[in-house]
């Protein structure tokens, strides 16, 4: 590694440590020429392959900027956006691939954004999933509502689906279970 002070091409690693929760390595180096010390950070690169075929480095800032547009006017804090971007990066990096298609980034954004703010999710999804009609919005809203309603429940807990033509013989007598959300 080139010394930032004297530009000498060689340096010696004095110390190495994990940084940023294990996603990077921090190295203290000493220049073999001038003896001055400096710090470097090493992180595995993640390339995003765009639809045009061009590749560019993954950028959390770009994820935040895109999601921020969908969150405009919504009660979403910058900390929430930073956490969402971190979750997206973690999900994309967990694929183990050094290069991911841009579509994978969009898919990785949808889940955490849905948890963060449903209106922002609909805004983002309408662009990312290319909604073309009111029916597309209605379908997405219906899916959100059915998820919010949760599965049907009985007095003893979650209802189990009964195959057509079968009789549900689950016990109705016994200990009552309390389920909270």
Curated annotation (Swiss-Prot):
Keywords: ATP-binding, DNA-binding, Metal-binding, Nucleotide-binding, Repressor, Transcription, Transcription regulation, Zinc, Zinc-finger
Protein's job: Negatively regulates transcription of bacterial ribonucleotide reductase nrd genes and operons by binding to NrdR-boxes.
An example Gene Ontology biological process: negative regulation of DNA-templated transcription
Gene: nrdR
One Gene Ontology MF term: DNA binding
Domain ATP-cone residue range list: 46-136
Official protein name in the record: Transcriptional repressor NrdR
unnamed zinc-finger residues: 3-34
Annotated spans, Disordered: 148-181
UniProt remark on cofactor binding: Binds 1 zinc ion.
Signal peptide start and end residues: none
Presence of the UniProt keyword GTP-binding in the record: no
PROSITE patterns: ATP_CONE (PS51161)
């Amino acid at each position: 590694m080139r010394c930032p002070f004297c530009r000498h091409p060689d340096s010696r690693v004095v110390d190495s440590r994990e940084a940023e929760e294990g996603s990077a390595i921090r190295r203290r180096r000493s220049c073999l020429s001038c003896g001055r010390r400096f710090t470097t950070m090493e992180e595995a690169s993640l390339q995003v392959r765009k639809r045009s075929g061009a590749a560019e480095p993954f950028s959390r800032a770009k994820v935040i900027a895109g999601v921020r547009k969908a969150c405009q006017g919504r009660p979403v804090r910058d900390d929430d956006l930073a956490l969402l971007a971190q979750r997206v990066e973690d999900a994309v990096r967990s694929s183990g691939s050094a290069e991911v298609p841009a579509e994978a980034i969009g898919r990785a954004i949808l889940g955490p954004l849905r948890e963060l703010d449903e209106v922002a999710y609909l805004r983002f999804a309408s662009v990312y999933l290319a909604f073309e009609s009111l029916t597309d919005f209605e379908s997405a809203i219906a899916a959100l509502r059915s998820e919010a309603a949760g599965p049907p429940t009985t007095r003893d807990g979650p209802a189990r689906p009964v195959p057509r033509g079968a009789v549900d013989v689950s016990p109705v007598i016994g200990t009552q279970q309390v389920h909270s959300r």
